[in-house]
Protein backbone atom coordinates (compact mmCIF):
# COMPACT_ATOMS: atom_id res chain seq x y z
CA UNK A 1 0.00 0.00 0.00
CA UNK A 2 1.98 3.02 -1.28
CA UNK A 3 -0.43 5.39 0.49
CA UNK A 4 0.58 3.97 3.87
CA UNK A 5 4.32 3.32 3.54
CA UNK A 6 6.90 4.85 1.22
CA UNK A 7 8.89 1.60 1.43
CA UNK A 8 8.36 -1.53 3.50
CA UNK A 9 10.20 -4.73 4.29
CA UNK A 10 6.92 -6.64 4.24
CA UNK A 11 5.69 -8.27 1.04
CA UNK A 12 2.32 -9.81 1.82
CA UNK A 13 0.88 -7.72 4.65
CA UNK A 14 0.62 -10.64 7.05
CA UNK A 15 3.11 -9.47 9.72
CA UNK A 16 0.68 -8.13 12.33
CA UNK A 17 -1.86 -10.84 11.37
CA UNK A 18 0.65 -13.55 12.28
CA UNK A 19 1.64 -11.83 15.54
CA UNK A 20 -2.05 -11.52 16.39
CA UNK A 21 -2.70 -15.21 15.70
CA UNK A 22 0.24 -16.26 17.87
CA UNK A 23 -0.57 -14.01 20.86
CA UNK A 24 -2.92 -14.49 23.80
CA UNK A 25 -3.53 -10.72 23.84
CA UNK A 26 -2.84 -8.04 21.23
CA UNK A 27 -3.79 -4.42 21.82
CA UNK A 28 -3.31 -1.68 19.21
CA UNK A 29 -3.54 2.07 19.81
CA UNK A 30 -3.42 4.39 16.78
CA UNK A 31 -2.87 8.17 16.81
CA UNK A 32 -4.12 9.52 13.48
CA UNK A 33 -5.94 12.55 12.02
CA UNK A 34 -6.23 14.18 15.46
CA UNK A 35 -7.91 11.17 17.05
CA UNK A 36 -6.91 8.12 19.13
CA UNK A 37 -8.31 4.70 18.18
CA UNK A 38 -7.92 1.30 19.86
CA UNK A 39 -8.80 -2.36 19.43
CA UNK A 40 -7.95 -5.52 21.38
CA UNK A 41 -7.76 -9.18 20.32
CA UNK A 42 -7.57 -12.40 22.34
CA UNK A 43 -5.91 -15.25 20.40
CA UNK A 44 -6.81 -13.48 17.15
CA UNK A 45 -10.46 -12.79 18.05
CA UNK A 46 -11.47 -9.07 18.29
CA UNK A 47 -12.98 -8.20 21.68
CA UNK A 48 -14.73 -5.10 20.31
CA UNK A 49 -14.85 -3.02 17.12
CA UNK A 50 -12.29 -0.27 16.52
CA UNK A 51 -13.27 2.58 18.81
CA UNK A 52 -12.30 6.22 19.27
CA UNK A 53 -11.00 6.97 22.76
CA UNK A 54 -9.67 10.54 22.60
CA UNK A 55 -7.98 13.41 20.77
CA UNK A 56 -4.27 13.80 19.93
CA UNK A 57 -1.73 15.91 18.08
CA UNK A 58 0.61 12.92 17.63
CA UNK A 59 0.80 10.35 14.85
CA UNK A 60 1.91 6.75 15.26
CA UNK A 61 0.94 3.28 16.44
CA UNK A 62 1.57 1.44 19.71
CA UNK A 63 1.21 -2.34 19.73
CA UNK A 64 1.19 -4.48 22.88
CA UNK A 65 1.21 -8.26 22.48
CA UNK A 66 1.86 -11.33 24.61
CA UNK A 67 3.19 -14.51 22.94
CA UNK A 68 1.00 -17.57 23.39
CA UNK A 69 2.67 -20.08 25.74
CA UNK A 70 0.57 -22.89 24.26
CA UNK A 71 2.30 -22.33 20.90
CA UNK A 72 5.82 -21.25 21.94
CA UNK A 73 7.95 -23.24 24.36
CA UNK A 74 9.89 -20.05 25.23
CA UNK A 75 8.05 -16.74 25.61
CA UNK A 76 10.69 -14.53 27.25
CA UNK A 77 12.60 -12.10 25.05
CA UNK A 78 16.39 -11.91 24.84
CA UNK A 79 17.34 -8.27 25.40
CA UNK A 80 20.72 -8.65 23.66
CA UNK A 81 19.12 -9.88 20.42
CA UNK A 82 16.61 -7.01 20.45
CA UNK A 83 19.36 -4.49 21.28
CA UNK A 84 21.48 -5.75 18.38
CA UNK A 85 18.65 -5.31 15.90
CA UNK A 86 17.66 -1.86 17.21
CA UNK A 87 21.30 -0.71 17.11
CA UNK A 88 21.43 -1.84 13.47
CA UNK A 89 18.22 0.08 12.70
CA UNK A 90 19.62 3.24 14.31
CA UNK A 91 22.65 3.10 11.99
CA UNK A 92 20.47 2.44 8.93
CA UNK A 93 18.10 5.32 9.76
CA UNK A 94 20.38 8.10 10.93
CA UNK A 95 19.16 10.74 13.36
CA UNK A 96 16.19 8.60 14.46
CA UNK A 97 16.13 7.82 18.18
CA UNK A 98 15.03 4.33 19.26
CA UNK A 99 14.68 3.35 22.93
CA UNK A 100 14.65 -0.19 24.32
CA UNK A 101 13.11 -0.39 27.80
CA UNK A 102 13.26 -3.65 29.76
CA UNK A 103 10.91 -3.50 32.73
CA UNK A 104 11.94 -7.00 33.88
CA UNK A 105 15.20 -5.75 35.40
CA UNK A 106 16.38 -2.70 37.32
CA UNK A 107 19.79 -1.09 37.70
CA UNK A 108 21.65 -0.45 40.99
CA UNK A 109 19.62 2.73 41.58
CA UNK A 110 16.34 0.85 41.17
CA UNK A 111 15.56 2.34 37.75
CA UNK A 112 14.09 0.29 34.92
CA UNK A 113 16.75 -0.64 32.34
CA UNK A 114 16.49 1.66 29.34
CA UNK A 115 18.92 1.82 26.41
CA UNK A 116 18.75 4.54 23.72
CA UNK A 117 20.01 3.97 20.16
CA UNK A 118 20.92 6.96 18.01
CA UNK A 119 23.38 7.53 15.19
CA UNK A 120 24.28 10.95 13.84
CA UNK A 121 26.48 9.58 11.04
CA UNK A 122 24.38 6.54 10.08
CA UNK A 123 26.09 3.87 8.01
CA UNK A 124 29.44 5.73 8.08
CA UNK A 125 29.48 5.10 11.83
CA UNK A 126 28.29 1.54 11.13
CA UNK A 127 31.39 0.85 8.99
CA UNK A 128 33.68 2.41 11.60
CA UNK A 129 32.09 0.23 14.28
CA UNK A 130 32.64 -2.91 12.16
CA UNK A 131 36.35 -2.19 11.73
CA UNK A 132 36.77 -1.14 15.36
CA UNK A 133 35.14 -4.34 16.64
CA UNK A 134 37.18 -6.41 14.18
CA UNK A 135 40.37 -4.61 15.30
CA UNK A 136 41.08 -3.61 11.70
CA UNK A 137 43.14 -0.47 11.01
CA UNK A 138 41.61 1.88 8.46
CA UNK A 139 43.61 2.92 5.39
CA UNK A 140 41.49 5.97 4.57
CA UNK A 141 41.09 9.02 6.87
CA UNK A 142 37.31 8.51 6.92
CA UNK A 143 34.82 6.16 5.25
CA UNK A 144 33.59 7.13 1.78
CA UNK A 145 29.86 7.93 1.82
CA UNK A 146 27.51 7.70 -1.16
CA UNK A 147 23.89 8.82 -1.20
CA UNK A 148 21.68 8.93 -4.28
CA UNK A 149 18.08 8.75 -5.43
CA UNK A 150 17.02 7.44 -8.83
CA UNK A 151 13.83 9.22 -9.92
CA UNK A 152 12.59 6.76 -12.61
CA UNK A 153 12.72 3.72 -10.29
CA UNK A 154 12.26 5.71 -7.05
CA UNK A 155 15.15 3.71 -5.54
CA UNK A 156 17.22 5.37 -2.80
CA UNK A 157 20.83 4.28 -2.29
CA UNK A 158 23.15 4.70 0.70
CA UNK A 159 26.63 3.19 0.67
CA UNK A 160 29.59 3.61 2.99
CA UNK A 161 32.94 1.92 2.44
CA UNK A 162 36.35 1.82 4.06
CA UNK A 163 39.56 -0.03 3.23
CA UNK A 164 41.52 -1.59 6.08
CA UNK A 165 44.65 -3.67 6.70
CA UNK A 166 42.81 -7.02 6.88
CA UNK A 167 42.69 -9.67 4.16
CA UNK A 168 38.95 -10.33 4.14
CA UNK A 169 35.87 -8.67 2.68
CA UNK A 170 33.12 -7.52 5.05
CA UNK A 171 30.06 -6.34 3.12
CA UNK A 172 26.68 -6.08 4.83
CA UNK A 173 23.68 -5.32 2.64
CA UNK A 174 20.14 -4.19 3.40
CA UNK A 175 16.89 -3.69 1.50
CA UNK A 176 14.27 -1.59 3.28
CA UNK A 177 16.20 -2.23 6.54
CA UNK A 178 16.18 -6.04 6.02
CA UNK A 179 19.60 -7.71 6.15
CA UNK A 180 20.05 -9.50 2.82
CA UNK A 181 22.72 -11.96 3.96
CA UNK A 182 22.94 -13.57 0.51
CA UNK A 183 23.38 -10.21 -1.21
CA UNK A 184 21.61 -9.72 -4.52
CA UNK A 185 21.49 -7.17 -7.31
CA UNK A 186 22.38 -4.21 -5.05
CA UNK A 187 25.60 -5.93 -3.92
CA UNK A 188 26.38 -7.01 -7.50
CA UNK A 189 26.06 -3.38 -8.64
CA UNK A 190 28.32 -2.20 -5.82
CA UNK A 191 31.02 -4.78 -6.57
CA UNK A 192 30.88 -4.05 -10.29
CA UNK A 193 31.40 -0.33 -9.70
CA UNK A 194 34.28 -0.87 -7.25
CA UNK A 195 36.13 -3.14 -9.69
CA UNK A 196 35.56 -0.96 -12.77
CA UNK A 197 36.42 2.40 -11.17
CA UNK A 198 39.61 1.24 -9.42
CA UNK A 199 40.72 -0.78 -12.47
CA UNK A 200 40.23 2.20 -14.79
CA UNK A 201 42.06 4.54 -12.39
CA UNK A 202 44.96 2.11 -11.93
CA UNK A 203 45.33 1.47 -15.67
CA UNK A 204 45.16 5.18 -16.52
CA UNK A 205 47.87 6.00 -13.99
CA UNK A 206 49.96 2.91 -14.84
CA UNK A 207 49.80 1.63 -11.25
CA UNK A 208 49.41 -2.06 -12.16
CA UNK A 209 52.40 -2.36 -14.50
CA UNK A 210 54.85 -3.64 -11.85
CA UNK A 211 52.57 -6.40 -10.55
CA UNK A 212 52.87 -8.57 -13.72
CA UNK A 213 49.69 -10.34 -12.54
CA UNK A 214 46.21 -9.72 -13.90
CA UNK A 215 44.11 -8.20 -11.10
CA UNK A 216 40.58 -9.54 -10.57
CA UNK A 217 37.44 -8.31 -8.83
CA UNK A 218 38.36 -10.26 -5.69
CA UNK A 219 41.60 -8.29 -5.35
CA UNK A 220 39.71 -4.98 -5.18
CA UNK A 221 37.55 -6.30 -2.33
CA UNK A 222 40.29 -7.59 -0.04
CA UNK A 223 40.32 -5.50 3.14
CA UNK A 224 37.05 -3.80 2.20
CA UNK A 225 34.35 -3.08 4.79
CA UNK A 226 31.09 -1.73 3.41
CA UNK A 227 27.41 -1.18 4.11
CA UNK A 228 25.08 -1.17 1.09
CA UNK A 229 21.56 -0.02 1.96
CA UNK A 230 18.79 0.53 -0.59
CA UNK A 231 15.17 1.58 -0.24
CA UNK A 232 13.07 -0.09 -2.94
CA UNK A 233 9.29 0.59 -3.32
CA UNK A 234 8.55 -2.89 -4.70
CA UNK A 235 11.31 -5.30 -3.64
CA UNK A 236 11.49 -8.71 -5.28
CA UNK A 237 13.28 -11.24 -3.11
CA UNK A 238 14.54 -14.63 -4.21
CA UNK A 239 12.75 -16.97 -1.81
CA UNK A 240 10.44 -16.32 1.14
CA UNK A 241 13.28 -15.61 3.58
CA UNK A 242 14.16 -12.24 1.95
CA UNK A 243 17.89 -12.92 2.07
CA UNK A 244 18.64 -12.06 -1.59
CA UNK A 245 17.35 -9.13 -3.67
CA UNK A 246 16.24 -9.89 -7.23
CA UNK A 247 15.24 -6.47 -8.71
CA UNK A 248 17.40 -6.19 -11.84
CA UNK A 249 17.08 -2.38 -12.14
CA UNK A 250 18.65 -1.87 -8.70
CA UNK A 251 22.03 -3.15 -9.96
CA UNK A 252 22.41 -0.28 -12.42
CA UNK A 253 21.21 2.32 -9.92
CA UNK A 254 23.77 1.26 -7.28
CA UNK A 255 26.55 0.85 -9.87
CA UNK A 256 25.99 4.37 -11.23
CA UNK A 257 25.72 6.01 -7.79
CA UNK A 258 28.89 4.36 -6.45
CA UNK A 259 30.90 5.00 -9.64
CA UNK A 260 30.06 8.73 -9.73
CA UNK A 261 31.21 9.38 -6.16
CA UNK A 262 34.20 7.02 -6.28
CA UNK A 263 35.57 8.54 -9.51
CA UNK A 264 35.45 12.00 -7.96
CA UNK A 265 37.02 10.74 -4.71
CA UNK A 266 39.99 9.12 -6.46
CA UNK A 267 40.70 12.25 -8.51
CA UNK A 268 40.55 14.45 -5.41
CA UNK A 269 42.53 12.06 -3.15
CA UNK A 270 45.47 10.66 -5.19
CA UNK A 271 47.41 9.64 -2.06
CA UNK A 272 44.53 7.52 -0.72
CA UNK A 273 43.93 6.12 -4.22
CA UNK A 274 47.53 4.90 -4.44
CA UNK A 275 47.29 3.36 -0.95
CA UNK A 276 44.28 1.29 -2.03
CA UNK A 277 45.81 0.34 -5.41
CA UNK A 278 49.02 -0.80 -3.67
CA UNK A 279 46.89 -3.04 -1.44
CA UNK A 280 45.10 -4.39 -4.53
CA UNK A 281 48.45 -5.26 -6.16
CA UNK A 282 49.57 -7.04 -2.97
CA UNK A 283 46.25 -8.90 -2.92
CA UNK A 284 46.80 -10.06 -6.52
CA UNK A 285 50.31 -11.29 -5.71
CA UNK A 286 49.06 -13.04 -2.56
CA UNK A 287 46.19 -14.59 -4.54
CA UNK A 288 48.65 -16.09 -7.00
CA UNK A 289 50.80 -17.42 -4.12
CA UNK A 290 47.64 -18.79 -2.45
CA UNK A 291 46.62 -20.51 -5.70
CA UNK A 292 49.95 -22.32 -5.78
CA UNK A 293 49.63 -23.19 -2.06
CA UNK A 294 46.09 -24.52 -2.62
CA UNK A 295 47.36 -26.65 -5.47
CA UNK A 296 49.95 -28.10 -3.10
CA UNK A 297 47.20 -28.93 -0.57
CA UNK A 298 45.18 -30.48 -3.40
CA UNK A 299 48.14 -32.35 -4.90
CA UNK A 300 49.32 -33.64 -1.53
CA UNK A 301 45.93 -35.19 -0.77
CA UNK A 302 45.76 -36.75 -4.25
CA UNK A 303 49.32 -38.10 -4.31
CA UNK A 304 49.45 -39.36 -0.74
CA UNK A 305 46.06 -41.07 -0.91
CA UNK A 306 45.08 -41.81 2.68
CA UNK A 307 48.18 -40.11 4.11
CA UNK A 308 46.47 -38.88 7.26
CA UNK A 309 48.27 -36.67 9.81
CA UNK A 310 50.56 -38.69 12.10
CA UNK A 311 48.94 -37.33 15.28
CA UNK A 312 45.41 -38.25 14.20
CA UNK A 313 43.88 -41.05 16.29
CA UNK A 314 41.26 -42.17 13.78
CA UNK A 315 38.06 -44.11 14.42
CA UNK A 316 37.16 -47.50 12.96
CA UNK A 317 33.79 -46.46 11.49
CA UNK A 318 33.82 -45.42 7.80
CA UNK A 319 30.36 -43.84 7.52
CA UNK A 320 30.90 -40.02 7.74
CA UNK A 321 27.41 -39.52 9.21
CA UNK A 322 28.40 -41.56 12.27
CA UNK A 323 31.94 -40.16 12.67
CA UNK A 324 33.17 -37.32 14.88
CA UNK A 325 36.50 -35.47 14.78
CA UNK A 326 37.63 -33.72 17.96
CA UNK A 327 40.18 -30.90 17.64
CA UNK A 328 42.01 -30.67 20.98
CA UNK A 329 44.85 -28.44 22.16
CA UNK A 330 48.20 -30.15 22.55
CA UNK A 331 49.45 -33.71 22.97
CA UNK A 332 48.57 -33.95 26.68
CA UNK A 333 44.91 -33.12 26.02
CA UNK A 334 45.09 -35.45 23.05
CA UNK A 335 46.27 -38.25 25.33
CA UNK A 336 43.40 -37.95 27.81
CA UNK A 337 40.89 -37.47 24.99
CA UNK A 338 42.10 -40.69 23.36
CA UNK A 339 41.66 -42.54 26.66
CA UNK A 340 38.09 -41.32 27.10
CA UNK A 341 36.84 -41.63 23.52
CA UNK A 342 34.77 -44.30 21.86
CA UNK A 343 37.18 -45.70 19.25
CA UNK A 344 34.33 -46.83 17.03
CA UNK A 345 33.22 -43.36 15.90
CA UNK A 346 35.33 -40.70 17.70
CA UNK A 347 38.63 -39.49 16.21
CA UNK A 348 41.09 -37.14 17.96
CA UNK A 349 43.42 -34.61 16.30
CA UNK A 350 45.75 -32.76 18.72
CA UNK A 351 46.80 -29.28 17.56
CA UNK A 352 50.11 -27.74 18.54
CA UNK A 353 49.51 -24.49 20.44
CA UNK A 354 47.43 -21.65 19.04
CA UNK A 355 46.71 -22.01 15.36
CA UNK A 356 47.29 -19.18 12.91
CA UNK A 357 45.01 -16.14 13.20
CA UNK A 358 43.64 -16.24 9.64
CA UNK A 359 42.02 -12.82 10.06
CA UNK A 360 45.49 -11.24 10.09
CA UNK A 361 47.38 -13.59 7.75
CA UNK A 362 47.81 -13.56 3.99
CA UNK A 363 45.99 -16.40 2.26
CA UNK A 364 49.04 -18.31 1.02
CA UNK A 365 50.44 -18.36 4.59
CA UNK A 366 47.24 -20.06 5.71
CA UNK A 367 47.57 -22.95 3.26
CA UNK A 368 51.25 -23.32 4.17
CA UNK A 369 50.50 -23.61 7.91
CA UNK A 370 51.14 -27.17 9.15
CA UNK A 371 48.25 -27.34 11.65
CA UNK A 372 45.76 -26.04 9.09
CA UNK A 373 47.03 -28.50 6.49
CA UNK A 374 46.50 -31.28 9.06
CA UNK A 375 42.88 -30.19 9.59
CA UNK A 376 42.25 -30.24 5.83
CA UNK A 377 43.86 -33.66 5.45
CA UNK A 378 42.14 -35.22 8.48
CA UNK A 379 38.71 -34.01 7.36
CA UNK A 380 39.32 -35.20 3.81
CA UNK A 381 38.24 -31.88 2.28
CA UNK A 382 40.08 -30.17 -0.56
CA UNK A 383 39.92 -26.84 -2.35
CA UNK A 384 38.34 -26.61 -5.79
CA UNK A 385 35.30 -28.02 -7.56
CA UNK A 386 34.43 -28.23 -11.25
CA UNK A 387 32.41 -25.02 -10.95
CA UNK A 388 34.76 -23.00 -8.69
CA UNK A 389 38.47 -23.53 -8.13
CA UNK A 390 38.26 -21.76 -4.74
CA UNK A 391 35.21 -23.56 -3.37
CA UNK A 392 35.44 -26.12 -0.58
CA UNK A 393 35.11 -29.66 -1.92
CA UNK A 394 33.24 -31.84 0.58
CA UNK A 395 32.84 -34.88 -1.68
CA UNK A 396 35.30 -36.88 0.46
CA UNK A 397 34.44 -35.39 3.88
CA UNK A 398 35.24 -38.07 6.48
CA UNK A 399 33.31 -36.71 9.50
CA UNK A 400 29.90 -35.05 9.82
CA UNK A 401 30.77 -33.70 13.25
CA UNK A 402 33.76 -31.42 13.72
CA UNK A 403 33.98 -30.75 17.46
CA UNK A 404 36.25 -28.02 18.81
CA UNK A 405 37.26 -29.16 22.30
CA UNK A 406 39.52 -26.73 24.16
CA UNK A 407 40.03 -25.99 27.85
CA UNK A 408 37.38 -23.99 29.70
CA UNK A 409 39.89 -21.24 30.60
CA UNK A 410 40.69 -17.97 28.77
CA UNK A 411 43.48 -19.58 26.75
CA UNK A 412 41.18 -22.36 25.60
CA UNK A 413 38.53 -19.83 24.65
CA UNK A 414 41.08 -17.95 22.56
CA UNK A 415 42.18 -21.12 20.76
CA UNK A 416 38.54 -22.06 20.08
CA UNK A 417 37.95 -18.57 18.65
CA UNK A 418 40.96 -18.90 16.33
CA UNK A 419 39.78 -22.31 15.08
CA UNK A 420 36.23 -21.02 14.59
CA UNK A 421 37.54 -18.02 12.65
CA UNK A 422 39.50 -20.32 10.34
CA UNK A 423 36.51 -22.63 9.83
CA UNK A 424 34.15 -19.69 9.16
CA UNK A 425 36.50 -18.05 6.65
CA UNK A 426 37.82 -21.12 4.83
CA UNK A 427 35.38 -23.97 5.54
CA UNK A 428 32.11 -22.07 5.75
CA UNK A 429 30.21 -24.87 4.02
CA UNK A 430 30.78 -27.03 7.14
CA UNK A 431 29.09 -24.37 9.29
CA UNK A 432 26.21 -23.93 6.84
CA UNK A 433 25.54 -27.67 6.78
CA UNK A 434 25.53 -27.90 10.59
CA UNK A 435 28.71 -29.97 10.94
CA UNK A 436 30.58 -27.70 13.40
CA UNK A 437 30.20 -28.03 17.19
CA UNK A 438 31.90 -26.60 20.27
CA UNK A 439 32.38 -28.90 23.25
CA UNK A 440 31.52 -27.48 26.66
CA UNK A 441 34.13 -28.97 29.03
CA UNK A 442 33.80 -28.27 32.75
CA UNK A 443 36.14 -25.86 34.51
CA UNK A 444 36.12 -27.70 37.88
CA UNK A 445 35.64 -31.15 39.36
CA UNK A 446 34.47 -31.02 42.98
CA UNK A 447 34.98 -34.35 44.77
CA UNK A 448 34.26 -35.76 48.22
CA UNK A 449 34.76 -39.47 48.74
CA UNK A 450 33.01 -41.26 45.91
CA UNK A 451 30.73 -38.32 45.13
CA UNK A 452 31.74 -35.83 42.48
CA UNK A 453 30.15 -32.87 40.68
CA UNK A 454 31.41 -31.08 37.57
CA UNK A 455 31.12 -27.28 37.47
CA UNK A 456 31.28 -24.95 34.46
CA UNK A 457 31.29 -21.62 36.37
CA UNK A 458 32.49 -20.21 39.68
CA UNK A 459 28.88 -20.11 40.91
CA UNK A 460 28.39 -23.80 40.08
CA UNK A 461 31.64 -24.64 41.88
CA UNK A 462 30.41 -22.93 45.06
CA UNK A 463 27.05 -24.68 44.74
CA UNK A 464 28.83 -28.04 44.38
CA UNK A 465 30.89 -27.37 47.53
CA UNK A 466 27.68 -26.45 49.36
CA UNK A 467 25.99 -29.65 48.18
CA UNK A 468 28.86 -32.00 49.03
CA UNK A 469 30.32 -30.34 52.13
CA UNK A 470 27.95 -27.67 53.35
CA UNK A 471 30.18 -24.96 51.89
CA UNK A 472 33.40 -26.15 53.61
CA UNK A 473 36.05 -25.95 50.87
CA UNK A 474 38.76 -27.62 52.98
CA UNK A 475 36.76 -30.86 53.16
CA UNK A 476 36.48 -31.38 49.38
CA UNK A 477 38.98 -31.90 46.57
CA UNK A 478 38.70 -29.33 43.78
CA UNK A 479 40.40 -29.99 40.47
CA UNK A 480 40.65 -27.10 38.00
CA UNK A 481 40.98 -28.04 34.34
From Swiss-Prot:
The lineage of its organism: Bacteria, Pseudomonadati, Bacteroidota, Chitinophagia, Chitinophagales. It catalyses: ATP-dependent breakage, passage and rejoining of double-stranded DNA. The record marks 354, 357 as: Interaction with DNA. Keywords: ATP-binding, Cytoplasm, DNA-binding, Isomerase, Magnesium, Metal-binding, Nucleotide-binding, Topoisomerase. Residues 323-442 form the Toprim domain. One of its GO terms (molecular function) is ATP binding. Its cofactor is Mg(2+); Mn(2+); Ca(2+). Few gyrases are as efficient as E.coli at forming negative supercoils. Not all organisms have 2 type II topoisomerases; in organisms with a single type II topoisomerase this enzyme also has to decatenate newly replicated chromosomes. This is DNA gyrase subunit B. Signal peptide: none annotated. Heterotetramer, composed of two GyrA and two GyrB chains. In the heterotetramer, GyrA contains the active site tyrosine that forms a transient covalent intermediate with DNA, while GyrB binds cofactors and catalyzes ATP hydrolysis. Its EC number is 5.6.2.2. Mg(2+) 2 binds at residues 407, 409.
Amino acid sequence: DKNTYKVSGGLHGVGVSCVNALSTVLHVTVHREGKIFEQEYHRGVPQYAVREIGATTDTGTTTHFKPDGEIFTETSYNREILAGRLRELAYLNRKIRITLTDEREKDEQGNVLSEPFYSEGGIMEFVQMLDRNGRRNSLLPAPIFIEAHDAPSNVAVEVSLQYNDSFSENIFSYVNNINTIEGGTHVAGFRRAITRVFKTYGDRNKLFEKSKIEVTGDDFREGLSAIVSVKVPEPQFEGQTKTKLGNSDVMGVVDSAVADVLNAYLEEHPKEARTVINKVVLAAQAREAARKARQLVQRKSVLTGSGLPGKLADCSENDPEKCELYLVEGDSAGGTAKQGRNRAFQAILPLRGKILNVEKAMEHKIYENEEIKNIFTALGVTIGTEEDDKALNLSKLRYHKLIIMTDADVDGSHIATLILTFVFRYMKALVEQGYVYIAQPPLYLVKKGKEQIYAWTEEQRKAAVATLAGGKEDSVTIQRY
